[in-house]
């Protein structure tokens, strides 16, 4: 999906690059890479049964804003970011792509996470040429992420839009229970 996003960006005349953990960014080429920018994006991976437009809606929203700015000549240094391993149903740990580049997650937190094929995240990153110790992302003025609702709160209240400033950080645990199932 990241390659397809890059190809779409090229069709539209946008530049693209991947950071040290494989997150993909599209940008308007008229702006210096050193100039502060707004980052709009989300992720392209999803959890099983996560919803058809789970993270993709945020990527499309960023592309629409960037296209509007380009078409109307609006002075808006914007990048669209597609983070990797945000849901990470493969490694049992979420927000890896964004966490590593913001220094909210460190190598020792995730490097030994194992996927369904028995590979550690460290091994996968080594094979792909990514780093578990990337530089901290720089230059972001603000970050905006459009996302699907993951519950029914808006629907129950009859609201079309909800705005949040933080989310609950998910934690997963593996638990082994020893004993007998003798009561429901």
Regions found by a protein language model. Give the residues of each.
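Flexible, glycine/charged-enriched surface loops at secondary-structure junctions
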Residues: 19, 77, 132-136
